[in-house]
Amino acid sequence: MELRPAQRQEAAICYQCIEDARAYHRSLGFIQWHPDYPTQQTILDDIARGIGYVFSDGTGVIGYCCIVIGDEPAYHEIDGAWKTDRPYAVVHRMAFYRRARGGGLSKEAFSLIRTFCRSNHVDAIRLDTQQENKVMHHILDREDFEYCGLIQFDGGPKLAYEWDG
């Protein structure tokens, strides 16, 4: 698997990954993203800003995420404390096609994200997720992300995590 910048012509495929993840989250009984966010336009905006990335394998695109190297204003206020005050990257909108899930996919994805961040001289990664997203909590624990507290993002409280390499 590889992590590479998303291309404009891949926006629909990336959005389908988001839709597959939405359906998966609903099947688990929670909503990670509201129906009006993220949209395909959100992905096009990510791509235009150079922060949209795809995970691909021999069959093509299997996942999408947004990686921002630098400040996330929503993370300035936290009910808790971040592990580091060094520069960091933020991962948003991480989603995979249903057919691709399992088999160590998240482990490989986070390894690629860490490598990408290190190549950009950043060794801390932050992200947030819904309280109900137990699958992601498990993945983040396994990947040595530490729960840091609550932030307000996208209209409500989110659990904030940080990996400090």
Question: Predicted regions: what is each one?
Answer:
Residues 2-16:
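A short beta-loop-alpha structural element at the N-terminal edge
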Residues 22-42:
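Conserved GNAT-fold acetyl-CoA-binding loop/helix
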Residues 49-65:
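Conserved beta-hairpin
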Residues 66-101:
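Conserved acyl-donor/pantetheine-binding loop and adjacent beta-alpha core of acyl/acetyltransferases
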Residues 84-85, 150-165:
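C-terminal "cap" of GNAT-fold acetyltransferases
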Residues 96, 102-115, 138-142:
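Conserved acetyl-CoA-binding loop-helix of GNAT-fold acetyltransferases
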